[in-house]
Regions:
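Terminal accessory/targeting
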Residues: 1-78, 94-103, 162, 210, ...
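Catalytic domains of cell-wall/extracellular-matrix polysaccharide-remodeling enzymes
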Residues: 137-243, 247-263, 269-270, 276-277, ...
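Active-site beta->alpha N-cap acidic-glycine motif
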Residues: 45-169, 279-280
Length: 283
C-alpha cells in the first residue's frame, strides 16, 4: 500500500521524523545512517556520520490537493538490496515473494551482469521497487567529478530502459552512501555535498540505511552471521532501512532472508518499499 502525502503534511512528517528518530538512527531521506560505522561494514560501503543537510527535491509542490495520508505503521522496515541483479537475485526474489514481502533494489548495470538484467522486469512486475545505484560501481570513475557521476547515472538509466521505465526512477543510493569518504580520494572533500545538492535539485531522493547486514565485507559470512548482524543492528529501532546485497558473491544473504523476514514479522514490523516509507512530495 502506497502512502500518499500532501506537500505540507510531507514536510511536517519529515520534520517530526528527523527530530524523533534522527538522534537515534541519524537518518532522513538520504540520511539513514549510524553515527558510528557498524562493525564489519567497509568504510567504502558506509555512511559514517549523520547528514543533516537534506532538503526536499525541487519538484516538491505547495499544492495541497492530495488525499490525506494513511497512517504509517508504528514499526516498519525497508529491505533494500544493492549491486544486483546477479545469479543471487532469483533466490532473493523467491524468498520475498513466498513471504509476500516487497523490497527495494538499488541496481547496477556494469556490463558484467547483462544476462541478469531481465530480472529487473520480473522484480518490478512482482511489486518490488527498482531504484538507481550505479552503472559501473567504480569509485575511481564515478567520483572523479559531478559530471562523471551523472554520466554514470545516465548510462545506468540507458541500460535499464529495456526492462523498466527508467525515467520514472527517482530514488537512488550513492555507492558508499551519501557521506562516504572514499570519494574524497578522487573528487575532493566537497564532491558529495555538491552531488547531494544536485540530486535534490534534479528531483531525485538519495537513500542511505541505518541497519547493515555486513554481507559484503569479504570472508563470505554465513547466513547465520548475516541474520545476527541484522538483529543486532536493528536493536531497539522501530523504523529501519536495511542494507543488504544481491550480488554474485553474497549468496548467503538469500539463504538468510527467510529468517530475517520472519524475525521482523515476529517483532511486529510492517514491510515497506522505500517509496512507501518516504514518498516524494506529490505535485
Amino acid at each position: 500500500m502506497t502512502f500518499f502525502r500532501s506537500s505540507k503534511h510531507q514536510r511536517l512528517w519529515w520534520s517530526l521524523l528527523l527530530l524523533s528518530v534522527g538522534a537515534a538512527a541519524g537518518f532522513g531521506l538520504g540520511i539513514f545512517c549510524g553515527t558510528e560505522p557498524p562493525v564489519g561494514c567497509r568504510e567504502s560501503d558506509l555512511t559514517p556520520v549523520p547528514d543533516e543537510s537534506f532538503v526536499f527535491p525541487a519538484s516538491a509542490s505547495s499544492v495541497e490537493t492530495s488525499p490525506e495520508p494513511e497512517p504509517m505503521p508504528e514499526k516498519w522496515v525497508c529491505l533494500t538490496f544493492d549491486d544486483g541483479p546477479s545469479k543471487t537475485t532469483p533466490d532473493v526474489l523467491s524468498a520475498l515473494n513466498r513471504a509476500g514481502v516487497k523490497a527495494t533494489f538499488f541496481v547496477v548495470a556494469t556490463g558484467n551482469n547483462d544476462k541478469y538484467l531481465p530480472l529487473i522486469s520480473e522484480a518490478a512486475a512482482a511489486g518490488h521497487q527498482i531504484a538507481l545505484h550505479s552503472a559501473s560501481h567504480e569509485y575511481s570513475d564515478i567520483y572523479q567529478s559531478a559530471d562523471a557521476y551523472w554520466k554514470d547515472i545516465d548510462l545506468l538509466k540507458e541500460r535499464l530502459s529495456p526492462y523498466v521505465r527508467a525515467d520514472g526512477l527517482w530514488y537512488l543510493r550513492f555507492p558508499g552512501g551519501s557521506t562516504n569518504t572514499v570519494s574524497r580520494r578522487y573528487g575532493g572533500r566537497g564532491l558529495m555535498q555538491q552531488l547531494k545538492e544536485e540530486v535534490t535539485a534534479k528531483g531525485y531522493a538519495y537513500v542511505d540505511w541505518n541497519v547493515c547486514a555486513e554481507d559484503a565485507v569479504g570472508g563470505k559470512p554465513s547466513a547465520g552471521t548475516i541474520f545476527r548482524n541484522i538483529v543486532r543492528e536493528t536493536g531497539e529501532q522501530t523504523q529501519c532501512i536495511v542494507l543488504m546485497h544481491d550480488s554474485a558473491t553474497t549468496r548467503t544473504t538469500a539463504e538468510a532472508l527467510p529468517d530475517i523476514i520472519q524475525w521482523y514479522k515476529d517483532n511486529g514490523f510492517a514491510f515497506l518499499t522505500v517509496e512507501q516509507a518516504v514518498p516524494l512530495p506529490t505535485t
